[in-house]
Structures are given as C-alpha cells and as structure tokens.
Amino acid sequence: MSEEKVIDIIGLKKSFGENEVLKNINFSINRGDVTCIIGSSGSGKSTLLRCINLLEEPTGGKILYNGQNILETKNIPAYRAKVEMVFQSFNLFDNMTVLKNCMVGQQKVLKADKEKAKKEAMYYLEKVGMAPYINAKPRQLSGGQKQRVAIARVLAMKPDVILFDEPTSALDPQMVGEVLEVIKSIAELGLTMIIVTHEMAFARDVSNHVVFMHDGVICEEGTPQEIFTAPKCPETKAFLTRFMNN
C-alpha cells in the first residue's frame, strides 16, 4: 500500500438539528487502502460516507482529497466522478437497460462517446458476471444482480476512490456471498476503497485498515489483526463479542 494520502478527514462534524451524529472525526486513507468501517447501527458510519461524497454537508471540519479541501469545491459532479459511491439500494435507472445504466454516467459526466462508453461498460459487466444481462431492465434482476450492475457502473467511471455503503444490507442472505466475492476481486485490483459493512469475516479478510465507530466517534483504528484479535477500546471488544456470539 502507498503512503500517499488520498483522503484526509480533519475534525469532521455533522449535526441534524440538535442531534450530533459525527463528533470530531479524524482519519486518513492512503492510495490503495481497503478500509472497512464497522460499528453498531446508528454509530455514524453511513453519515460519514455520505459526507465524504458530499451527499450530506458537514457541519464542521475539513475533507481533503489529494490535498484540496473538497468543502470549498465548486464542481461537485467532477469530484463525485473521482470519489464514486455504491449504495445499499442500488440506485439504478429503472427505465434503462443494464448496459445503458453503465454507459450514461460516462457519457454525461466524462463526456465519453457512445462506442467508448459501451466498450468500458461491457468490460466491467463481464468482470462482475453480468454481461449476459445487458438488455435486461433492473426490475428483471435479483438484488445481487442489481448490486453487481451498480458496481460495474461505478468501475466504468474509473474513479480514484470507491465508497460502499453497506452494499449487502438490502440483499437476501443467499445473495450476499456473490456480491462480497465481487468486491473482494475489485480489492485485488489495488483500488482505493472505503466500505461500511456489518460483515465482520469479510472486513477481516478484505481490508488492510479497519475503523471502529461508536456513538459518532472513532474509538479505534488499525490493521484487521489489531482490531479483530487485540482490540484496545472496551466498546470495540463489546461489539466484536456480540458478533461472535451471534
């Protein structure tokens, strides 16, 4: 993994009215890192991801992307093309085929011509095992298939960083494995990824950096071995014990 910082979060805060959801968050992501953010529901994990993608506007602090404070950016679509997000609810266009779903962002944001967009879309749909379904509409697909299309769509945009917001939480249990395998294969390509997940075995296997959040703060971060085998924070220990017991 590189020591080059891609994303640096400094003193990040986010409140919804009186409810402070993120409380002075500080951590950084190096190029090539696969970072898994874990913690109980309501700990602020998804809000943090949405702030990084500017879907939520932070209340305070800085988010540096390649050294630039993105909270001062004037071109949010260009930034989001570099820091793409895979949503738990897929966010596919229901009226478009699988192929069109993977082409439209390239054409509108990257200004790719039709042939180039189609070539890239086909390449990544093949990679996630969805090439046979290029003419299908999302309603004809299973949840696992929809998520694989959503991942291919993001990969086709050639992003610098990919954010995954609980990518398996909306799936039937039998579909979870196929999506996790796709994400593992992407991690092996050396892409920079931040993954919010409740899948502890997956987090341990796929990441080189684990962040544990509790009640809007980062309690602890480290390598998977440090977090899963020798956690220091009492909240981390309690959280992992609950998972082991379940």
PLM region descriptions:
Residues K137-L141, Q145:
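Conserved ABC ATPase signature
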Residues I162-D165:
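Catalytic Walker B motif of ABC-type/P-loop ATPase nucleotide-binding domains
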Residues I70-E84, K114-E115, E188, A230-P231:
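ABC ATPase NBD coupling module
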Residues A156-D160:
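A short, proline-enriched helix->beta-strand linker immediately N-terminal to the Walker B motif
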